[in-house]
Amino acid sequence: MIATRNSSTHKPIETIANELERADKVLIGAGAGLSTADGFEYSGAWFQENFSDFAAAYGMTDAYTAGFYPFPDETEKWAYWSRYINHNRYLKEPGSVYQDLLTLVHNKDYFVLTTNVDHCFQRAHFDKQRLFYTQGDYGLWQCATPCHQATYDNHDQVVAMVAQQHDRHIPAELVPRCPRCGGQMTTNLRADDTCVQDPGWYAAAKRYQAFVSEAAQSRTLLLELGVGMNTPAIIKYPFWRMTYHNPRAHYATVSLDAVAPKQISERSTVVQADIASVLRLLAGA
């Protein structure tokens, strides 16, 4: 499959604006690049400012790789994770990127499929019934085994952990335990096949499939934002297939390394540019 690239920005943005206006349905695919464009940080000065103690102790350089670190005990692990969750799930508010995107689609029949777990779409006031976040949510905990298929809001516990941690440890009594089996809890993230899919997950999946079925018979804009090749089977490849099989579909992708396959190149718009700038231009069109 040969990929096509488009380095010019102005005309592709006009094309996306026209396709958006003409579309009966808009399917948004959002990856990590969208939140990065909105100012969410994971390394550099931000990491040093907020995790200097962990960086000094273990040589950590960024939040992503630090999340895989085998901490020696639960009290230290949850000191790190509570601080990280607090910053990226509760303290950092969605900014202009999400507001510009909502401005573009709030009067359209839209749906959002996202691999992001920062809850930004809901916090930016997108309609919850039009969201399917497939990979979990930093704001939810689950049994690590798991012994049952349920998730639990963690806001109050996370805030308590952050407030009471000292020397990279939380009090032992704050370590979360499964309310059923008493075992370890973990964040509801899709790292492997133990990720809990609760009734809310299945309800969202059903709404997404219903939207996709209707979109397959409609004039549809598939708008992909910040989606790389980390998990292409969730958003990118399905979007390519949907565009290929629906002659009334148009695929638009925006990221610094955006590409589209040759087979749908005549109905694709590729913008290799900063997502924030593109959405700002579109929202002001």
Language-model segments: residues:
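Conserved catalytic alpha/beta core of Sir2/sirtuin-type deacylases, generalized to analogous enzyme cores
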Residues: 1-285
